[in-house]
């Protein structure tokens, strides 16, 4: 794949008629010095000897300052405020909290659920991007008559820790200021300070993999469980798989005063085959309730004897086991070659690709986060599109009312964590081409630091034709290949795999995509039994119907600087004109817009019959036709929950009742079901409660919450491992540009030697002569 070269736009109006911004000479330039308390009380110091007005900022990697422009300011910051926490920072945060424990018993009971960076106020992010980190963008800050207030340093980075005390069954949230954290190779100078701590009553934090492993061990050692397995012909406990599931909230018995799990049981056929598909033999009829705080089985009942399904000969998916061990022999290598390397540039977590730029983040709960998305648009400069993009929750409700399937209602982000379950990706398998990987650092349950190497993949993909036109009169044609930049990660939650992707396109589109694969969650059947709530996969084995819902949170900033809040949301429906004088041919239809003025009216559902979509517009920026600039949310395939409104899981997942929610930005509103959905007894917490404030959305800082899902009626072709299912949505420019931003994409060199490059047709052998055929 050839690398793209830079060209000016072919559209004379692209970029608009506004003149490029000029930096105004600051009269009394000042420096804001941040105190330890991180307030913005500034001591003012003359900057005449340090800074002077400039037209551009040099790269901080340059050894010598440019002749024209700003002298390189002394900067001690090595990490951007939006960068994920490093391993050293996590260690400091954990050590600081542990040292702050009231007594040894409290410190010994601390278990660390999550340690993540505290994302600062948007104004702090703007300061960092303007003056501390290349490509230095002072235009991000609003101009004032007195000139910019330029800090000598940024406030300290902060960590937020969710801590579960296993001895007291309490959950607490801590904020730690990471005043100085340097690598050990630089002297090991580590320092943190507790800013705040708070015990959160009546909640349970997400479960941890260490808890799941311990739960499996204690269940397999529980004598009544061993006897129940013997009743089913299983005496080797090494064959048994115990998958702990959070109990959700169905009644007061599930209250968060206890930390509970109800495991699902499976059984392999061969303990010497670690890659055997153990999910092919579910064990039903055994009820187990585990106290995860004290790690004891508190309820057990062998309720119903259901024979184990016989081993399915098609259950395995490894090369030596699938289809008799015979793989396809006609698959030839397909290589992605970029002889000049990729077209993207990476500086830390900052990514530039053609006209796009953004920052990559990662959290234990959400996984991949995309920050500060902007498009560099000619003379109009850097134009923001979104402040923050991420997948904040997913819910998987099952449709079988029988035990144990009715309680399968997983909140995979809020109960487990998408980021904590991420994969270490492999080149050539998970991603192809010239790849940049990013590692992710987490705390484990006891406070140690673990690293998932190659957790996030950044690479370019060819995506077919971008645009083409051939003049039928002259036969002359112009065609451009489409290329997209993809940022992705994959995670495993029990039996399912999910891939989360953000695609950036040359025509200004952003596509969010989820790829679903993995293994079905199955149930066992009695001999001769069938169920209407699922699909029979093999003798004695069936897959219940279920749904997957994903919630994307999009903090939009269309043409808005960090301090601005000039966005609004309109809904567009295509209407059919009534019969009459204006529609004598009965062919008329038109697009009708409706402004979503407040949160109460901004709870919306998809409507494919009216081609419904939503546009986020800037109320103070126009394109060359005088229309407001905007980006529109275009739904893909979608659905709503098929459970009745009284379903118990909807108490915690009220946000599933609509496909779109729009709220006014509030920094503490991050998760649609509240921060702690595990065993949450409070109905409608999160989005459904926030929108009751009915805040105005007219010219504000808006956040889109898009809920999209898929209804999975399993089929035999989903067994033993599911081919990838695709689902997602698109953010598309709508009047944001003055013409197509893709017209300046250079043409690819067409292959001229077609005779050598084209695939040769297979020539069939000549038919044998009749006489020879009769002899054979």
From Swiss-Prot:
Its main location: other. Its EC number is 1.4.3.21. This is Amine oxidase [copper-containing] zeta, peroxisomal. The modification 2',4',5'-topaquinone is found at residue 496. Keywords: Copper, Disulfide bond, Manganese, Metal-binding, Oxidoreductase, Peroxisome, TPQ. It is found in: Peroxisome. Pathway: Amine and polyamine degradation; putrescine degradation. PANTHER family: AMINE OXIDASE [COPPER-CONTAINING] ZETA, PEROXISOMAL (PTHR10638:SF18), COPPER AMINE OXIDASE (PTHR10638). Gene3D superfamilies: 3.10.450.40, Copper amine oxidase, catalytic domain. One of its GO terms (biological process) is lateral root formation. GO terms for molecular function: aliphatic amine oxidase activity; copper ion binding; primary methylamine oxidase activity; quinone binding. Binds 1 copper ion per subunit. Can also use zinc ion as cofactor. Contains 1 topaquinone per subunit. It comes from Arabidopsis thaliana. Homodimer. Substrate binds at residues 410-421, 493-498. Its cofactor is Cu cation; Zn(2+); L-topaquinone. Belongs to the copper/topaquinone oxidase family. Topaquinone (TPQ) is generated by copper-dependent autoxidation of a specific tyrosyl residue. Mn(2+) binds at residues 555, 701. The active site is at residues 412, 496. One of its GO terms (cellular component) is cytosol. It catalyses: a primary methyl amine + O2 + H2O = an aldehyde + H2O2 + NH4(+). The record marks 774-776 as: Microbody targeting signal.
């Amino acid at each position: 794949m050839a690398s793209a070269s830079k060209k000016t736009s072919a559209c004379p109006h692209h970029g608009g008629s506004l003149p490029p911004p000029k930096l105004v000479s600051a009269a009394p330039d000042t420096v804001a010095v941040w105190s330890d308390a991180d307030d913005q009380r500034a001591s003012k110091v003359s900057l005449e000897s340090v800074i002077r007005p400039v037209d551009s900022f040099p790269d901080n990697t340059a050894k010598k300052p440019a002749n024209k422009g700003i002298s390189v300011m002394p900067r001690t910051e090595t990490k951007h405020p939006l960068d994920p926490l490093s391993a050293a920072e996590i260690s400091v945060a954990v050590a600081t909290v542990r040292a702050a424990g009231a007594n040894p018993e409290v410190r010994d009971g601390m278990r660390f659920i999550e340690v993540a960076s505290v994302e600062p106020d948007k104004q702090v992010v703007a300061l960092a991007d303007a003056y501390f980190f290349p490509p230095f963008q002072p235009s991000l800050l609003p101009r004032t008559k007195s000139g910019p207030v330029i800090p000598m340093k940024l406030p300290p980075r902060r960590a937020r820790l969710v801590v579960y005390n296993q001895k007291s069954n309490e959950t607490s949230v801590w904020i730690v200021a990471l005043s100085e954290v340097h690598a050990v190779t630089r002297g090991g100078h580590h320092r943190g300070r507790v800013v705040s701590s708070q015990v959160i009553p009546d909640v349970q934090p997400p479960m941890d993999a260490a808890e799941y492993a311990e739960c499996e061990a204690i269940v397999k050692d529980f004598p009544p469980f061993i006897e129940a397995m013997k009743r089913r012909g299983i005496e080797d406990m090494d064959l048994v798989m115990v998958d702990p599931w959070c109990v959700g909230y169905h009644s007061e018995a599930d209250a968060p005063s206890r930390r509970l799990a109800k495991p699902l049981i499976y059984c392999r056929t061969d303990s010497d085959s670690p890659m055997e598909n153990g999910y092919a033999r579910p064990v039903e009829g055994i009820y187990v309730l585990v106290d995860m705080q004290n790690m004891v089985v508190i309820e057990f009942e062998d309720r119903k004897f259901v024979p184990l399904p016989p081993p399915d000969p098609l259950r395995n998916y490894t090369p030596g086991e699938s289809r008799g061990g015979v793989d396809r022999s006609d698959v030839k290598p397909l290589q992605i070659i970029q002889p000049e390397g990729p077209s993207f540039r990476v500086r830390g977590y900052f990514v530039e690709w053609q006209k796009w730029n953004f920052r990559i983040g990662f959290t234990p709960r959400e996984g991949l986060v995309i920050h500060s998305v902007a498009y560099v648009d000619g003379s109009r400069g850097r134009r923001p599109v979104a402040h923050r993009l991420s997948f904040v929750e997913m819910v998987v409700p099952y449709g079988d009312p029988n035990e144990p399937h009715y309680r399968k209602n997983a909140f995979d982000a809020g109960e487990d964590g998408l980021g904590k379950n991420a994969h270490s990706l492999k080149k050539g398998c998970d991603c192809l081409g010239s790849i940049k990987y990013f590692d992710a650092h987490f705390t484990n349950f006891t406070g140690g630091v673990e690293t998932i190497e190659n957790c996030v993949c950044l690479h370019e993909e060819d995506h077919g034709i971008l645009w083409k036109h051939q003049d039928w009169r002259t036969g002359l044609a112009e065609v451009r290949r489409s290329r997209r930049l993809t940022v992705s990660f994959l995670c495993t939650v029990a039996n399912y795999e999910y891939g989360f992707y953000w695609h950036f396109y040359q025509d200004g589109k952003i596509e969010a995509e989820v790829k679903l694969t993995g293994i079905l969650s199955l149930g066992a059947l009695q001999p001769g039994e069938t169920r209407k709530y699922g699909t029979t996969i093999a003798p004695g084995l069936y897959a219940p119907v279920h749904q997957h819902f994903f919630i994307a949170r999009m903090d939009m900033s269309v043409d808005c600087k960090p301090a601005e809040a000039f966005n609004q949301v309109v809904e567009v429906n295509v209407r059919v004109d009534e019969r009459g004088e204006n529609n004598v041919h009965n062919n008329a239809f038109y697009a009708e817009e409706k402004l979503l003025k407040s949160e109460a009216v901004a709870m919306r559902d998809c409507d494919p019959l009216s081609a419904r979509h939503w546009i986020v517009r800037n109320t103070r920026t126009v394109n060359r036709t005088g229309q407001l600039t905007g980006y529109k949310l275009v739904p893909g395939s979608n659905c709503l929950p098929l459970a009745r409104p009284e379903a118990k899981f909807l108490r915690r997942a009220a946000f599933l009742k609509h496909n779109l929610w729009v709220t006014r930005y509030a920094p503490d509103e991050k998760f649609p079901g509240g921060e702690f959905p595990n065993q949450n007894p409070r109905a409608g917490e999160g989005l459904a409660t926030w929108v009751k404030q009915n805040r105005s959305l007219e010219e504000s800082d808006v956040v889109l919450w898009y809920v999209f899902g898929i209804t999975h009626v399993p089929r035999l072709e989903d067994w033993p491992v599911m081919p990838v299912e695709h689902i997602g949505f698109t953010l598309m420019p709508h009047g944001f540009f003055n013409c197509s931003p893709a017209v300046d994409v250079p043409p690819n060199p067409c292959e001229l030697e077609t005779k050598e490059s084209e695939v040769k047709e297979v020539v069939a052998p000549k038919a044998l002569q009749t006489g020879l055929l009769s002899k054979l």
